[in-house]
């Protein structure tokens, strides 16, 4: 009887381990990314900016969609309304109530110039990439850097 309990327990652990392994593998994107074909001009990655001591100059209309804007005392003011790939025509006045923003991707620069192995696949999520002609190309698809192949990304016109 004790042997059956041990076998059942080991079978249970084996099934549990297989389930954990399969769920972990679903999060791994095995797709290799392509090399840049030379047409990405720049990217916009909305970042958290300002602080209660060093306020920013913006308004809800001009603020980036997905970023939340707060007063100096931490009160939520609004979510930004302007999307980087299709910016709204907004007044350039500063809302005196807005002191800082919180955006999904907080570190690094807002305006980036892709080089080397940057494609839509390797570009960071929450970043928007534009061609050298200034037209929107794609949103980044990678949370972490990925390996690249020698093929060209069909979304980047050569």
From Swiss-Prot:
Annotated signal peptide: 1-24
Annotated site residue numbers, Reactive bond for trypsin: 92-93
Disulfide bonds: 33-121, 37-117, 45-127, 57-94, 60-78, 61-90, 67-103, 120-138
Site-annotated residues for Reactive bond for chymotrypsin: 35-36
Protein name: Proteinase inhibitor type-2
Chain positions of Sequence repeats: 29-86, 87-146
Species this chain originates from: Solanum tuberosum (Potato)
Family under the similarity heading: Belongs to the protease inhibitor I20 (potato type II proteinase inhibitor) family.
GO MF, any single term: serine-type endopeptidase inhibitor activity
Superkingdom as given in the UniProt entry: Eukaryota
Keyword line: Disulfide bond, Protease inhibitor, Repeat, Serine protease inhibitor, Signal
Keyword Chloroplast attached: no
């Amino acid at each position: 009887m004790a042997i059956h309990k041990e076998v059942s327990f080991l079978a249970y652990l084996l099934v549990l381990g297989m389930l954990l392994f399969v769920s972990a593998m679903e999060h791994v994107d095995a797709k290799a990314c392509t090399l840049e074909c030379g047409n990405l001009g720049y990217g916009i990655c909305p970042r958290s900016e300002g602080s209660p001591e060093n306020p920013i100059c913006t308004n809800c209309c001009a603020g980036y969609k997905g970023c939340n804007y707060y007063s100096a005392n931490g009160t939520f003011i609004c979510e930004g309304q302007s999307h980087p790939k299709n910016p709204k025509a907004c007044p350039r006045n500063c809302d005196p109530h807005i002191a800082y923003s919180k955006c999904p991707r907080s570190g690094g620069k807002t305006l980036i110039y892709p080089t080397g192995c940057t494609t839509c696949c390797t570009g960071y999520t929450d970043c928007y990439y534009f061609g050298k002609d200034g037209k929107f190309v794609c949103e980044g698809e990678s949370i972490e850097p990925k390996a690249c192949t020698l093929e060209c990304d069909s979304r980047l016109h050569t």
